[in-house]
Amino acid sequence: MKLIRGIHNLSQAPQEGCVLTIGNFDGVHRGHRALLQGLQEEGRKRNLPVMVMLFEPQPLELFATDKAPARLTRLREKLRYLAECGVDYVLCVRFDRRFAALTAQNFISDLLVKHLRVKFLAVGDDFRFGAGREGDFLLLQKAGMEYGFDITSTQTFCEGGVRISSTAVRQALADDNLALAESLLGHPFAISGRVVHGDELGRTIGFPTANVPLRRQVSPVKGVYAVEVLGLGEKPLPGVANIGTRPTVAGIRQQLEVHLLDVAMDLYGRHIQVVLRKKIRNEQRFASLDELKAQIARDELTAREFFGLTKPA
């Protein structure tokens, strides 16, 4: 899969044109995968590559930060999942005020037609685009007739009466229903990132942790979990993780802290994927570090029981 970073690199787009879909693809859940499977069929019929157009940041994150939903996937993981789905190209557009000011007509004639040479387009029938959200599905249908590309609206993917959507995944996570979230996603929910130096508080109380900052992201989950850590060897490593602000030590920024069970290694600079397996408890504030230490010991015991591990002598 080829990643095209920004509209200034559109010369890297396929010269023969493409079949295209546009969206956030947050989580790359089973509904997204069904859409991409259909897009691949259209690509095969036309002998054209499949392209996904994404926006970074997502539009709501620019215009209404307080209303923007928690992200299920960072860009790096999103790209990995899209590659697994057989996508040929991803155009990652920097969504800023300048791009947002692009008229709907220019979005169609300049971006879709002139540079991407789109031959087939799949978007939701509620898709809006262009300055002031002036462009809609009806305008795209008219443009398709004028410029010679086919357009279809993406159907909501349902199973057993359950709508599969990023919103439904977030709700399952908010309800601590990891099994439902995994069923909707088609893969376990995980948080990924690079391990950075922390204040080493965990080390001083006997529970060294790998710290992964969540940056500007709002996490869809909070609390303490039994986890499996990928990216440190052939097998997943069991651990216990806290996702939150660490209120006991007056923390402010959200971060992910992982304590590996029975493994000691230097993780600084390593990129890890932390798969949530079981919710142990909500994050809470303790009156002292001794209370915190005692609770972490109980959390570790709960995680060990979940993984069927005995405590080393």
UniProtKB/Swiss-Prot annotation:
MF terms from GO for this chain are: ATP binding; FMN adenylyltransferase activity; riboflavin kinase activity
What is the protein named? Answer: Bifunctional riboflavin kinase/FMN adenylyltransferase
Provide the alphabetized UniProt keywords.
Answer: ATP-binding, FAD, Flavoprotein, FMN, Kinase, Multifunctional enzyme, Nucleotide-binding, Nucleotidyltransferase, Transferase
| Source species | Escherichia coli (strain K12)
Describe the family membership recorded for this protein in Swiss-Prot or TrEMBL. Belongs to the RibF family.
* Gene name in the database record: ribF
Per the record, the GO terms for biological process are: FAD biosynthetic process; FMN biosynthetic process; riboflavin biosynthetic process; riboflavin metabolic process
Catalytic reaction(s) noted: riboflavin + ATP = FMN + ADP + H(+); FMN + ATP + H(+) = FAD + diphosphate
Q: Which SMART domains match?
A: Flavokinase
